[in-house]
Amino acid sequence: MSLFGTSPEDSSAGNSAHRSKSSLFADEPSLGTGSNANLGSSSLFADDDDLSSGSPWNSNVNKRTARHKLVKTLLSDSDAPESYIDAYDLVLSAGDRVGAGIGLTSVREILSGSGISASDQEKILNIVVSGDIDSANGLGRGEFNVLLALVGLAQEGEDLTLDAVDDRRKKLPAPKSLYLDALRANQESGTPAPSQERPITPPRPASPQQAPNSAHSRRESMTGLESDPWGSPELHRGHAHAQLESDHPVLNGYGSVRSATNAWSSRVGEDNNPNEISNSNRANSQTDSAPSHGSGFGWGESLGNTPSDGGLGGTARAGLGGFGPPSSVHSDSNPRRRSLGIGRVASPPVEEHVTVTLLPEKEGMFMFQHRNYEVKSARRGSTVVRRYSDFVWLLDCLQKRYPFRQLPLLPPKRLSADSNAFLEKRRRGLVRFTNALVRHPVLSQEQLVIMFLTVPTELSVWRKQATISVQDEFTGRDLPPDLEDSLPSTLPDTFETVRGGVKRSAEIYINLCTLLERLAKRNEGLAADHLRFSLALQSLTEVTRDTYAIDTNDVPLLNEGIRATANHLSVSQSLLEDEARAWEEGVLEDLKRQRDCLVSVREMFDRRDRYARNNIPQLERRIENNERKLQDLRSRPQGTVKPGEIEKVEDAIIKDKESIVQQHARGVFIKECIRDEIVYFQQSQYHISRLHQEWSQERVKYAELQADNWRSLSDQVESMPLSG
């Protein structure tokens, strides 16, 4: 007997008779062979008829997976004609991008504009789009080539099978589609490509809770920057960047470097600058912000207070346990826009934004090729090309120089063959990494980061020419006399409390990201099934007159209602696909940003355990031994002590005491640094609030659009005949 009930053998024997019965609603597939199989049952609703074998290796899922792989590899770029390749690039540039491929909306437009019958459209869709297999990544070049080949075969009256495509491999047909012709005409005339048809119903009156301003759609924000979901705002050109003082030592190439602690002042000064942008262009503009150059020290300076006020300066917020920035600093945001005109509840100041675009061409010798990324900063007015290894080198340098800072995370490196889905995920990870750097008040002022974002030459060449410093940020700094007393005595307990909460929260957010990815993929699969349903209904209208041939008077009204249902299913498919895309580019990236933030804080505490150690107790014991030895040497009769031995012991004592002072000062600096990082991390809670507000508004908008779509269908099918 099994731990969870009847064993598989007993269950199979006990249910064999039940499986052999012919049931009208026998939806369950046959799992047996011979007498135990219901192969002979004429089940009207047995949808999984492919499961004709009891072997688990012959399941329907495995067959679909195998066919999907065949479709992807049947027509490679070398086999496809140039017209197929140009058509794919044309559709991709039109903006209907899902993952690294094209979406179902473009597939529907190509099929509907080809002039083939609805039944042929349905058959082609079922061949090319294999249900939930990789649906979230769109159609790649391989699937698109097969799609065009099947459309061409249908227009020539050939069989619609993969074998027919393979037989015509050397002479593939040239399909005709009004949609592709329109895209080509727009490209030749230089006019913008027509946006994909999104069924937009008349908006409802805005409720009092909604914000007065509404953002543009995500797709509109993507088209200007090669469909990058992190589209950089077009900032003003006259931005005056902060000038670095020339009396500081030159580090990391050229220019002068302010101390890491003073860098907080200029950064927070920018964030606190009043935002005087109108609501209409708030998401696409930037205000000039002059960094403050006060004479204060450390975090206190960044808050506009002197260290004499103690701690972080001024009156601390009660919610931060005696240290924290004023409320004006809490508006750190990422003003990304939601699709389909979702309004924002609040309009925080626009911050610097960096876009990362994957370049299509590989570089390097065979077997050692690599991908390049275009890194563009609108505020800095810079565009550079970097490799993934350049990002790795930058993070390695920052870990050596700023081990006790909240360093952003890099996406992992993949050694196996690159896939479009992986490359797109890594590109988005690089976007999060780069923008986390430019948001950080200290790391954004580091010369390595500035040079990484602005040096136009190849980074490996610049590294050979520049003088790069990766010394610990506390090296050479003197401890201010009042800094140690200004730190709260409960700081260690606060560190442990925050560390425990961050560890648990990071695990939860990792799980949330996985769940939301699954939800988005399910939405993509649901959209594909809606399109299949729509094409099946359209093909049904072709045979309705023959089906009811005795009296065809009501057939036109019947077909009109069926076509209305098919059209509204197509509208629903577009909405589902657009919503899934909005999730992947919006709330999913927001969750991943918060996840990366939590994991980076967790790793900061782990690095503190490894690198914040000292040997002060050992030095104190050694000083005591040397002092006793020195007294013994001085008490000896003159002439019995070797020359220079007393001076040697004295020098050892002095060096040990200096080392104790330096290590103690470093420990204080580490406490202050981690305290500052926790205060900076405190702002992420407001990002969580915006995340939930924007996602809820987005869900409401799509729910209203779907409801309006089905309400319109209900009105249109009222005229369908109900009786003779």
From Swiss-Prot:
Limits of the PX domain: 351-459
Biased composition (Polar residues): 1-17, 272-292
Keyword check for Membrane: yes
UniProt topology in membrane: Peripheral membrane protein
Gene Ontology CC terms: cytosol; endosome; membrane
Listed GO biological process terms: protein targeting to vacuole; retrograde transport, endosome to Golgi
Pfam families: PX, Snx8_BAR_dom
Renumbered residue ranges of the record's region Disordered: 1-39, 176-242, 265-342
Localisation per UniProt entry: Cytoplasm; Membrane
Main location: cytoplasm
SUPFAM superfamilies in the record: PX domain
Domain notes: The PX domain binds phosphatidylinositol 3-phosphate which is necessary for peripheral membrane localization.
Entries under PANTHER family matching the protein: SORTING NEXIN MVP1 (PTHR47554:SF1)
Similarity section: Belongs to the sorting nexin family.
Stated role: Required for vacuolar protein sorting.
Protein name per its UniProtKB record: Sorting nexin mvp1
Organism, scientific name: Aspergillus oryzae (strain ATCC 42149 / RIB 40) (Yellow koji mold)
UniProt gene name: mvp1
